């Protein structure tokens, strides 16, 4: 950070000033002094030149108003920026509030206690309240509209300072005896502040200043110290909050009169005076510190007595009240910034975020990329890359070097255990230094990594990509600098203060003035030089022969590293300090292509030096980005950071150096020959290129070729040779015009020469296909069909790249570009167009699979299958059907193309459905795919589960019927399959029998196929018996119930025999009833209590009725069972004795002939009765 005095304003009549305050928002400066002096000034920059911005622009007083109203010396002035009010107070205790009206300041309110003098006034952060403290201990808090909120008398206390906390909840009162008391915003005492900075201090002291930064522009770090308290003896403490037990302590070593934070709380200015041994009088100085107590520099100020200071709103200037003068100093902040490959990288803080906002602004395309980085320390750039040095974690002392590209993409983060206070970067290495040690890291960029290197990356440390050296060591460059962090913690008496590096040299500056030179990248100490200054910034020229040093006082000196000179003792030494010395320098940059050329910033002027001779200065306050090709690029960071979210290209400045300007003037005004001689005397590739271009314009091909040779431009030489082969002068002229980028003019010349082909060729080179198409169509001759097609396709690509698919389709149709057409139809969701395109393509066209995949992605199965089959990919077609759940189509395709995988696909999908408990979906899947046996198994399983739940019997019957129907379909399928195999050789009966035999072999594992209808029969009779019983057909109900004894494996025995006992009892067949009760009482599944209930019931029945059946003959035939059992009518449950009966074609069950006339559907399987 650098600072220098820039302006001085004298107060009339030599009236001594007492206080000064700069309005941060509007730029008004109020200063108060003796004899009631109160002035409001305003400095404004007035310039029409866009290059003169910021500090470089001349400033004039646009306001200089004397405010009348005070009679005594004005001692306190304070601004309310939110409400544009000025509050002042004099030695008589008179307080005046001033307001701005039509460009002038007027009294708004006056107040005078007539008891004591006002020592301090402070507005809170939002400008709503003011706190006024009087010397006699009186405190008044008032509102912005002049109303008193509360007042308090602190007895026996002399007050001298007051300040608000950021949230307006705390007030700090500074006492005349040096104590600071903490109060709440209602005036209640909380505690005394602990003042660590006054430990071991004796004698009387007073408070010089209290300033609490309110965080309005964000903080440089989370939990950053922001409350500064300083005493007249130079002791200072900076606290995070009012109760901070571990504040930052500073001993400024000066007599202090005032302190103030800058606008973002990153710099604390401490004003006062210091005794100098060589002089009798004290010297006025301003010291600058970071919130962490690091000293940034000292500004010496002329005059006898400094009394006050105030920062400008942007933090770029500071106003100092000295005697009867106001001095202004310009501040050149240490911005965190860098420049790499046309990109300006800069960081700033925001009040709404704890991190730094790092902006990568591509100045060429005017695009910006924003990254948020916690605890950013510095930004360093080189070539196309930059390094962000950050703190890894608040609680852990580890740091990170993040390698980024020019759009802010992190490429490689490197964690290190030393503080990267100083960072330098070359094209291959990053060097970071703490105060004691150096760390070097050979970084790799992804595009340069080979497969071998990627494999070896884990062992990279051993191969020397990272090394650490202590600053006191003498490395030899062989195997020194092993990766050992213990070196980094060893202290040193002479800390590092600056570093720089080039591809072959590393320079380290130390606080004593010693400069250490190392070879690089094999770090070996070559030389030590001793200088009389403490370096702040070091810079090597492009061939590493000369070192530029800017010291902490802003003095620029130069050191020749290799010159051998004889010193005063007659000894020959290496290295010489050059005579050139410049003061108030805050930035410098060597030219990348000339070791004797550099640019430097001195105050608000830029100087260019060639061989240590300066050119005339340029007025600017920009930071230098780049210096090459005799052009300097600089950036007005001050302006950018006023509105960092919207950087403007106006803030990038390009300056040509004198030799480039002179050469251009010579060529324009004198001629090529004289200019050629001048450039010969001052050679540079950029000047030769300038000459070559001028010679080309005049068609002086010899001079142009010579100049291109001198600037090593091979393309230029080839172009001149091509021009030499052309016969026509106008043709040469047109080519040169095209070379200089004046394409419209060149095209016009080609067309005037009737060379439409050359005009088309020019537009082809430029990729201007719209114009190519236009030229092709407007020509009188036949257009080249292939070129026309190419143009149509290129225009189609243009529209497609911009997602204008409709426009693209029109051109792709004309260009017959089926591939891109398919893509456009797909993006437009024009599936009809896509289908038509697929139909128009020949078989096995390479685009068909792609189109088919497009159909698959949108679930259009039929079209996808058609496309796959057209390109002879039946497997893909089947996969599509499976993917889109078209299993019947999948099976059909698999069969028609003799594919075997369908079974495994079905099984896989079915298991997936079963995992999700979608059993019915799995059944439907198998049924659609004609896998009836698997579907039946699942359906049977569902029926069994439902039966176990004892839910509605009708539902269970339906499920068993469905299962049985699926089995019947399976039987039919097997018979048909076998018929297909036997090609008419045997009879139908034989083939059907073979089918059944094959089926028997297949179904040995599952016996339920043999009597698939058992479940259905069981529940059919179960329901039928109950229906008959309820309808009063008790005998028929008993006959039906007797059948249920065969189905104990399906219906629980307790239900069967309970129903049988009920039916038998109802039809007075007590013998059957008795057997049913015996069976019930013997069931093991029943509890003792249930058995007892059955016994009691049986006792009740059989005490009244003998256990004998009345009608023997019919029951006996049912009870006998065995092989000779009669068929049963499923409509009535009765045995069929007649020879005439109906057989169901589906379930093969019987119904009495006289009964079937009552039914339209089979009573069991519900198939229609024919």
From Swiss-Prot:
Q: In which tissues is it expressed?
A: Expressed at high levels in testis and at lower levels in the brain (at protein level). Also present in other tissues, including heart, uterus, spinal cord, ovary, liver, kidney, lung, pancreas and stomach.
Compartments where found: Cytoplasm, Cytoskeleton, Microtubule organizing center, Centrosome; Cytoplasm, Cytoskeleton, Cilium axoneme; Cytoplasm, Cytoskeleton, Cilium basal body
Which GO CC terms are listed, alphabetically? axoneme; centrosome; ciliary basal body; intraciliary transport particle A
Q: Which organism is it from?
A: Rattus norvegicus
What role does it play?
As a component of the IFT complex A (IFT-A), a complex required for retrograde ciliary transport and entry into cilia of G protein-coupled receptors (GPCRs), it is involved in ciliogenesis and ciliary protein trafficking. May promote CASP3 activation and TNF-stimulated apoptosis.
What PROSITE patterns does the entry give? WD_REPEATS_2, WD_REPEATS_REGION
Which BP terms from GO are recorded?
A: cellular response to glucose stimulus; cellular response to leukemia inhibitory factor; cellular response to tumor necrosis factor; cellular response to xenobiotic stimulus; cilium assembly; intraciliary retrograde transport; intraciliary transport; liver regeneration
SUPFAM superfamilies per UniProt: DPP6 N-terminal domain-like, WD40 repeat-like
Where are WD repeat segments found? 12-51, 69-108, 113-152, 154-193, 491-528
Keyword terms: Cell projection, Cilium, Cilium biogenesis/degradation, Cytoplasm, Cytoskeleton, Repeat, WD repeat
Principal cellular location given in the protein's record: cytoplasm
Q: Which Pfam families match?
A: Beta-prop_WDR35_2nd (PF23390), Beta-prop_WDR35_TULP_N (PF24797), TPR_IFT80_172 (PF23387), TPR_WDR35 (PF25170), Zf_2nd_IFT121 (PF23145)
Kindly indicate whether the keyword Cytoplasm belongs to this entry.
yes
Q: How does it assemble?
A: Component of the IFT complex A (IFT-A) complex. IFT-A complex is divided into a core subcomplex composed of IFT122:IFT140:WDR19 which is associated with TULP3 and a peripheral subcomplex composed of IFT43:WDR35:TTC21B. Interacts directy with IFT122, ITF43 and TTC21B. Interacts with IFT43. Interacts with CFAP61.
Alphabetized PANTHER family for the sequence: LD29485P, WD REPEAT DOMAIN-RELATED
UniProt-recorded name of the protein: WD repeat-containing protein 35
